[in-house]
Amino acid sequence: MGGPTPQPMGEASGSVAPLLKEDGKAFKIAVLIPTINNADELDIVLGRLAKQSYSHFEVIISDSKSKDHTKDVCEKYGATWIEDPSRNRADACNFALRQMDHDLVLFTDDDTVPPLDWVEKLVRWFDNPEVGAVGGPNFAPDDDPFGAKCADVAFCTKFMTAGTRYGAQPKGELVPITHNPGVNCAHRMANLREVDFFEPGCIGAEDVVLDAKIQRAGHKLFIDPSNVMPHRRRRPFKPYMKQMRNYGYTRMVANKRWPEISAWSHTAIGFFPVIVVTALLAMLYGGLTGGADADLWFSLSGEWDISRVAFHIPLGLICIYIAISWLGAAIGTSPHRSIGTVFLAPLFVFLAQWAYGQGVIKAWREIRRTGGRAGEGAQIDDRIRTA
């Protein structure tokens, strides 16, 4: 996107001086947002970007052939609209990135509520040449419904999250990190070009793969724990579980190609649905064969035959699971912790792990079929894809 320098996006033009490069020229900055059929929420995002304290940036929308009024929303706020033929976030971003000539690229999604100092707080760190990329945490916005806040608490629980990075808030101003979610991050364009941008055809976990590529090239990633991006959570129950199935599926397939992003917990969670079904069948057997008799409750005395073991051991493990979920939610990082959301955390953690495990199982089948090649399969999501 050569040619004339774009007009500042923010209404408060000049409220913060532009960030300068070593040669004294201002960094050319863009916010890149991939979108599809989500014009109303995109309107909120662009409205917030139009009021940023740092106004020296361009907004670029990579639109995968939306059938709603997305283009009109872009024109309303003066954002650059690009019609993109792809069906996944990685390819949508790549399509735009290959046309851009900016120095810094900030990434977010079309369902966020950017704070009015979000751009300022991200770009300020790039006066340090050691910073290759920087990001921040993301939580559900305050106006999300109760169910979405329950999902946020489950995502940000201290335990039970299968290695996810939601809500990470390490201590310090700028902390080294191995991954920043693509909803709240900024990269140097030179580094993006060096690694040839996102992995083509990556149907999910594309931000994790990108960060792995950038670190392979020797560049450093950081997180600013104070720069929080409110990001809408999927509502229970179908959209929430569909998203979690997609996370499990796409992460495991990506892990096959990029071993350095793999964690043992990603594989372990694939056995969760099998363990749950086995435990319930054991309890059913134990209950039907006398293992749940009244005199066997709240006592360790007496004979522990197979019926008693089959009923009470799984029941005890369920109680421990609930207790760990409660504890993890209570000491987690979500700002939406309350008596209600913490109380329901075991349910939301269970649903997330069940769905994530289903996604992992689907990924195992995909890997056996294709070897986990990029561009194979299709993501599981709740968007209407018209590209």
Residue ranges: model-predicted function:
Residues 84-100, 171, 175:
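Glycine-rich, basic loop-to-helix element that forms the pyrophosphate-binding segment
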Residues 48, 55, 63-71, 112:
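A conserved acidic beta->alpha catalytic loop
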Residues 199-262:
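Catalytic donor/gating beta->alpha subdomain of glycosyltransferases that bind UDP-sugars
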Residues 272-369:
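Membrane-embedded multi-pass helical conduit in multi-pass membrane proteins
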Residues 1-48:
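N-proximal low-complexity "stem/linker" segments adjacent to membrane-targeting elements
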Residues 117-153, 228:
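Conserved donor NDP-sugar-binding/catalytic core segment of glycosyltransferases
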Residues 105:
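Short aromatic/hydrophobic "clamp" motif used to bind/position activated sugar donors
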Residues 136-142, 154-177, 257:
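Short, flexible, basic/aromatic active-site loop/helix in glycosyltransferases
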